[in-house]
Amino acid sequence: MNSKKIEELDKTTNHLDNSRNNMYSCTFMEKGDEDNILNSTILKMNNTEKGISFQTIEEEIKDKNKISNIPSDYAEKEKYCFNELLYTKQNGYINIIEKEDKPIQEILTDDKKNISEIDSSKSDKMDPCLSSQKVDEEYKYGDNYNINGDNPVHNSDEINEDSKCECSFFISKCDYEKDSDANTNGPKKSCKDSEENINYYNNNLLLGISENKDTLIKCDKIFERSYYSTSASTVLASNENEQNLQNISSYETVSSMNEKIKLDGNGKYEKLEKEQTYIMNKETNVINPQDYSIHDIGTYRDECISYLNKIKDIPHNIGSQINSYQNNNIIGNNNFKDKSYLIHENDFFDVETKKKNILQNYFLVNNNNEINANEDMNNRSDDLKNIEAVASDLNEIIEEDTIQKKINISKNCKIEENINMNINDHNKNAVFNFNINRQLFHDNQGDENMYKTNFNTENNKSINIINGMSKEVYEQNSGDIHAQVENINNIEQTTNNIIENNMMIIQGSDDLRFTTLNCINDNSNTDIMKCKRKIKNDENRENIMIKTDQKNIKMKDELDEDDKDELYGIPDKKRRKKNKKKKIPGRVYKVIVRGKECWRAEWLVQKNQENIEREKEESKMDRYSIMKLENTKDVDKNINKMNTPNFQKKSKQFSVSVYGYENARLFALFELIKYNSVPDSLKEEASICIHNIKRNIMNSENSSNKSFSGHFLQFLLADENNEYSSLLYKRLEDNVIQNVNKYSMHEMNNINRMNLFQTQGKEIGFRNEKYFTVQYDNENGHGNNIVDGTIWNIQNNERNLFYNNNNKCRNDYYYNNSNDIIKMKKENNEKLTTFNDNNFYNKANYINRYNNPYVSNNNPSIHNLNNLVYNINSYDFNPMHIRNGYGNDSNSTINISSPNSNYHRGFGEEKDIQKKKNFFNINNTRKYVGDINNKPMDGFKQNLFEKVLNNLENNMGNNNLYNYNSLEHHINSKVKSTYPYNNDNITNDPANTTTMISHGANNNQISNETEIRNSQQILHDNLLVYRNFMNPSSCDIGNVDKNSENDRGEKMASNFEGAFLNKSNIVFKQNANFDPFLGRNVSNINT
């Protein structure tokens, strides 16, 4: 460089290109043979200043690290210089560590011998300080090498007036040719005054930082060897995004002189060129240093085998050669060259060792470069000599990179771990770097230089790693690193904190981490230490007793109660028991959403439930297909660990400002009720919830119209005698479900297939025959009772001719197990109808009950809350004056008959009528067409009318209170009736006819009480019910066909699709599209 450019770099105000926003700082410290720093320079590239400046920090470094009194033995033997690390987290420095055991001048001279002999006079002129001039010296291979030696400037004012420049330090700018050939003996490099790259050459390492801000360039070497130092050079870089120390170093054999490594945003490195070298890839698939320096890897047999099998394929080949030593005696000598070979315990543990000691020392030996051990035997330490002497009988003797590990557990429960590492000069395929801050200090004896390394973590725990730099290290060029881990209370937690803080980019698998041995002393026996530790069980699933030469270690499961109390530190020998958090199906809690207070309901729903419901509704499948779909999608709804993936969490919140504080919580609770997710703790509150909602909304002047929408409807229409009442179980025997179908077809599918009138009412929540009292409104037992009590007494064979055990002829297909449809129906019923605490809010129990015997003008129910609910529910066409009656409140055809009527007794007589009836489907509209003869009808048939009653809504005009238009059911038949008319001629008066109820909700208006009562009365008077003989069969009294049940069961779906028969032969049909409150105005009802 010329003096002008040096001056520019020396100015802190000098700014680089604005695009360079990821700057670093480099610290170079060089020490001579005395106790002073020869040259210290920081290349600071600050993120804010975006400039480069050179500063000398000699005194600052000296004071910080207390560098002094380097033993004279080193000076007598040889000179040594190295660069030391100073890492400042705030500034994000790049730090380069160089340790050399030869004088800089000698190293440079030796390195250049293979290229060109350097004149000693020129070598003497080499100035280590930054010079104002640049001399280009041409070498044999065409390299332009920039040194600052021809015109040395010893005036250090340009850099630092206190600097003593006795070690070499070079700066040059380098551009690289893209067509560089890695196979040539010499590199192709042109060094010129280019602004593209700024490279710093120190000893045998040249680090380039380009203006590209994310590229570190490894420049060419003057000598053809690895550019890393022969001992243990380490490059530590910090990434701007994470501002944490990153370790990017590896010891590798470099075949190319112009390798490039790209630094990405995550602090990882990717090789851009020359695939033949092993370098750190972008996945950083290397061994985590913690596995060597911190954890007790190899302590136990199974864990050691597992670990070694995991690391055998590491690119750096550590672990490819494994030999275990006990007391400096080799135990195994297998040479593992095949990467696919799985290590077995017999490869490095003999039988005797298994019995005596599992906790032992071992070596990880690298076998990449094989040489004759005799050439280097004298250069090894005494300990290594002994090891290699034992291994001399191997077929291939190598000079190896080794890592020696020794773990001791002291009586005070401290883990003492010693690690020795030897990196051979010719083999750079090992990874062992401490990503750390290092401070120089002296031990007590003063005969050994030590670096004390601190790992600072979030919990302020410190790991002290001692790196030895003994005299033997430098004399024998071994570069050993001795590390001892002291005072570690929780190794695993500390290591995890280091990784979480991104102090290491090398990441290890969780499988390679091992827990700490937490030990306690046995007072009765000082030689026994009791520890808790997770280990693998043997084949017999018995805990392994681990024994060492020093102590016996007893596993956690073998500790007695007193030992466990002492181990866990629990007073009075009362151990804590962790309460397992029980998952609940739903919960209600308060949250703040966008600054507003809300009550949120949270529940779990089956993942595929919505898809099932949508599929059933859109496809309009028949009953058999729906049952088949539900059975295939059946999932256990009990929340546990096994079926948790079958559920997904949903939530909904209600603002206090909109609904009010009390109502917001109640509405949230309604969400849980809707999705069958009320926890046990909220059941009592759910009982009160219905009453409060009705009180606050139905009777409140300030109530919102939102209360009538959606799933709140069934609660608003329920009276106080609903299933949420605290007296529910007492009322089950006194109340009958009336309005079963408060849901659409797909939701009530199972309910509609239930045998609602079976006698086991007490078990499933329905009426028990035992407590039922038959009521008649007139003497003959028929009168105005469209549905009388006799339909509940199914077991009375005298009344129910179709359920007669003697003639074996029955219309109850529910119990016909020979049919697959019926089997599935029974299974679904059993799931749905079990009435207990777990499903007390079952859909089958969303009912609308009323207790008043009948409603008339003299007893208006509009003034009673219970009847108000009923009257609002004007689409319910139940007979008003029938106590405990049953009716369906959706647009469906209900076929009900009394088994006590003369109609049953005349079954044989009416058989011909049944044969003339046909059921068929046209455009999804089921029509009943038939021609019944002019035979008189008696009894229950008094309420059947003459013709199709589908003209009522047309005659009533637009003000029709019941504009039912979604589905029409027509009965084209002439039926003579004795009631309510006095003659046999059926009138055609529209007032006495009605459409078979097909629910719609377009423009329905209910303006006052009178209209409600009148509409109910009209609906009651014109209610059409009929007995269904839809399946022709030979079943008759005294004429029994054994196959008749199967025949009827098979024909039921085809002849009357979507219908359901119970024991009383009552047929149910539903329409899923009915919305009772759509467009309906109920605001004018006087309460």
Curated annotation (Swiss-Prot):
Transcription factor which binds the 5'-[TC][AC]TG[AT]AC[AG]-3' motif. During the mosquito vector stage, plays an essential role in the zygote for de novo transcription of genes required for ookinete formation. One of its GO terms (biological process) is DNA-templated transcription. Disruption phenotype: Asexual blood stage is normal. Female and male gametocytes are formed but fail to develop into mature ookinetes. Zygote development is arrested at the ookinete retort stage; however, meiotic replication proceeds normally. In the zygote, transcription of several genes is affected. Infection of mosquitos with knockout parasites results in a lack of oocyst formation. The AP2 domain contains a non-canonical linker peptide between the second and third sheets. Transmembrane segments: none annotated. GO terms for cellular component: chromosome; nucleus. This is Transcription factor AP2-Z. It is found in: Nucleus; Chromosome. Keywords: Chromosome, DNA-binding, Nucleus, Transcription, Transcription regulation. One of its GO terms (molecular function) is DNA binding. The keyword RNA-binding does not apply. Residues 586-682 bind DNA. Belongs to the AP2/ERF transcription factor family. AP2 subfamily.
